């Protein structure tokens, strides 16, 4: 009787959480607004590329926006430039040095007879008066945005030592109450452009997550007469497969680093527990066995451990599980509520939602040093997801009662808003490198 009541309560809570998040309609591209950058952001100049005005996409403008959005760089407005060199021969270093600019990017876009473009760029160090790198791309016109993001990735890595994540995607769920199928699963470029709708449904969609190669996604859908099921969707072929539809809860899927397994939450035996599903053999392995609610599993990079949320100590806390011997130990001790964890690619930082003074914030725990820092100042944060380079965290929150996405650097020094043009967005998931 106790288990039955617990299962019913959990299901009611799950559905209530989803439906209460949707207040107004959502659709279209995400907007990008840097609300707080580093005080020591690096001054950089992206000179408008020669030939960009007549192109379908202005590659130089996209590169400038990417670098600005990272919060690590402070681009010089083009109107403030004393000169606009197109190449190394035209570079006048003193024109940028006097303005305090440390790096300069020049480039050109030349239309080819095939209809595509030759896009070249170069990066210069003003202090050393030296060219650091240069590259040339020959994309079709339809891939100019991809080239721009690739250039941003290369420059970001050259100057920070960290791979750029501008060519990645953001997966999220929206809701439009005026649509016959109001729930939508969508993804967009990391800068909010080129939105693609994967699924439309008249029932809630939850917990989207990427496969390690970025070719598939898994998610929870209530489309089967309101019952939750876990689906895998191939982005290239649009084929879908239902991989979990047991009685009770089917939730919180997460791909193993090798892409061979899904960790998930099931209540098929009466209590919400963590399971592992072999995607090839469909063999299901139970990993936890506790009277508390165990949910929200996330794989660690080594593929041998998971972190998950459990109520076994009273309130929700984060625990670490060894999948081989099934040993469990608690890893979060700050306050009475810690949930919805994610892990940086190097396994060093644990990111999760922490409750403090009635507010729900994103916190970052250093697993090596044991330190913990709250990195957001909003009060209804949920679903943090770490970028594949470990530098940023995207999460859902609320502004004026409406759901938006925001991103924050792992040290809390850079903050970016990604509100929808028309309404609510929830459940973000940052893609792997693509």
UniProtKB/Swiss-Prot annotation:
Subcellular location: Periplasm
Gene Ontology biological-process entries: cell division; protein import
Keyword Cell division: yes
Annotated signal peptide: 1-28
CC per GO annotation: periplasmic space
InterPro entries membership: 6-blade_b-propeller_TolB-like, PD40, Tol-Pal_TolB, TolB_N
Main location as per UniProt: periplasm
A Pfam family per the record: PD40
SUPFAM superfamilies tied to this protein: TolB, N-terminal domain (SSF52964), Tricorn protease N-terminal domain (SSF69304)
Keywords, sorted A to Z: Cell cycle, Cell division, Periplasm, Signal
Described function: Part of the Tol-Pal system, which plays a role in outer membrane invagination during cell division and is important for maintaining outer membrane integrity.
Assembly notes: The Tol-Pal system is composed of five core proteins: the inner membrane proteins TolA, TolQ and TolR, the periplasmic protein TolB and the outer membrane protein Pal. They form a network linking the inner and outer membranes and the peptidoglycan layer.
NCBIfam families associated with the record: propeller_TolB
Family designation: Belongs to the TolB family.
Protein name (record): Tol-Pal system protein TolB
Gene from which this protein is expressed: tolB
């Amino acid at each position: 009787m106790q288990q039955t009541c617990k299962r019913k309560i959990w299901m009611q809570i799950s559905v209530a959480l989803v439906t209460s998040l949707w207040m107004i309609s959502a659709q279209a591209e995400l907007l990008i607004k840097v609300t707080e950058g580093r005080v020591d952001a690096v001054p950089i100049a992206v000179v408008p590329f020669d030939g960009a005005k007549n192109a379908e996409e202005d590659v130089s403008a996209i590169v400038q926006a990417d670098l600005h959005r990272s919060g690590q760089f402070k681009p010089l407005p083009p109107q403030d430039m004393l000169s606009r060199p197109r190449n190394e021969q035209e570079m006048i270093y003193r024109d940028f040095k006097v303005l305090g600019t440390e790096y300069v990017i020049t480039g050109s876009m030349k239309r080819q007879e095939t209809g595509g473009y030759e896009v070249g760029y170069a990066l210069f160090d003003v202090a050393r008066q030296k060219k650091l790198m240069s590259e040339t791309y020959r994309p079709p016109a339809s891939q100019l945005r991809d080239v721009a993001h690739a250039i941003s990735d290369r420059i970001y890595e050259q100057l920070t030592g960290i791979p750029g994540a501008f060519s990645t995607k953001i997966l999220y769920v929206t809701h439009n109450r005026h649509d016959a199928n109001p729930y939508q699963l969508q993804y967009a470029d990391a800068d909010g452009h080129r939105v693609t709708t994967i699924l439309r449904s008249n029932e809630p969609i939850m917990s989207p997550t990427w496969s390690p190669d970025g070719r598939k996604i898994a998610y929870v859908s209530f489309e089967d007469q309101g019952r939750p099921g876990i689906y895998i969707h191939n982005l290239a072929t649009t084929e879908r497969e239902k991989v979990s539809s047991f009685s009770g809860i089917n939730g919180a899927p997460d791909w193993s680093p090798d892409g061979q397994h899904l960790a998930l939450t099931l209540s098929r035996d009466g209590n919400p527990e963590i399971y592992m599903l072999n995607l090839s053999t469909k063999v299901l392995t139970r990993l936890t066995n506790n009277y508390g609610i165990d949910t929200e599993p996330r794989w660690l990079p080594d593929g041998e451990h998971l972190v998950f949320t459990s109520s076994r100590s009273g309130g929700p806390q984060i625990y670490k599980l060894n999948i081989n011997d099934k040993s469990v130990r608690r890893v979060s001790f700050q306050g009475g509520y810690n949930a919805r964890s994610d892990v940086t690619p190097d396994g060093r930082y644990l990111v999760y939602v922490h409750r403090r003074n009635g507010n729900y914030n994103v916190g970052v725990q250093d697993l090596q040093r044991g330190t913990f820092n709250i990195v957001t100042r909003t009060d209804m944060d949920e679903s943090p997801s770490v970028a594949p380079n470990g530098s940023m965290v995207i999460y859902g929150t609320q502004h004026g009662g409406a759901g938006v996405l925001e991103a924050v650097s792992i040290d809390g020094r850079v903050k970016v808003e990604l509100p929808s043009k028309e309404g609510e967005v929830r459940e973000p998931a940052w893609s792997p490198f693509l």
